[in-house]
Amino acid sequence: MHKKGFVYLVGAGCGSADLITVRGLRLLQSCDAVVYDDLIDPALLAQAAHAEQHPAGKRCGRHSMPQSEINSLLVRLGQSGKTVVRLKGGDPFVFGRGGEEFLALQAAGVPCEEVPGISSCIAVPAAAGIPVTHRGASRSFHVITGHTAQTGDTLPESLEALAALHGTLVFLMGLNSLEQIAARLTAAGKPPETPAAVVSGGNAPHPA
């Protein structure tokens, strides 16, 4: 009987190889194939040295493989009977297009599961000693993509609405739109003296 494949969308955590979950590591060590994004720690890939390895790097402005091709690759590997780890930085379902891959696999009838990872939206502030919630200061936090701002598109929630919130605002992929984000927030009433931190390459050995 033909072996039925399975695809796990595994969050690698943020940066250091030892931030992956125990379950994610075990799946990586036992899989038949791994499809991995850019910025994955080579030490993690070494845990799957026995497996087929397929790079599918995606960084701003540099996509080595279109998303549609990644979806097709995952479906093809799963349908061939392999146990596949789709290794993604952070958490696959937090601005990682994991939802798109999950739906593509479901549509093709390939069994799949998401294995959560530590997202940069909490890991990077934590590494800088910044809690995203703090009693008496921030009772909530909001994660927003900053990438579409540079095209002039409206963000998932308008910046004007976000400016009125009292929680911590975490913008991912927003470095190139930093001036626009700050200007729109202050124009909408966010006090200019609001504490802020800007981190570039927060999952790198020496973030700026």
Per-segment meaning from a language model:
Residues 1-17, 22-118, 123:
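Class I S-adenosyl-L-methionine
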Residues 22, 38, 135-137, 193, ...:
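Non-catalytic, surface-exposed connector residues within folded enzymatic/regulatory domains
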Residues 25, 44-45, 76, 132-134, ...:
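Short secondary-structure boundary/capping segments
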Residues 91-165, 208:
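Class I SAM-dependent methyltransferase SAM-binding "motif I" and its flanking Rossmann-like core
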Residues 52-58, 109-113, 132-142, 189-198:
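Short hydrophobic/aromatic-enriched beta-strand-loop microsegments
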Residues 4-7, 79-84, 145-208:
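A contiguous loop/helix-start segment that scaffolds small-molecule binding in enzyme catalytic cores
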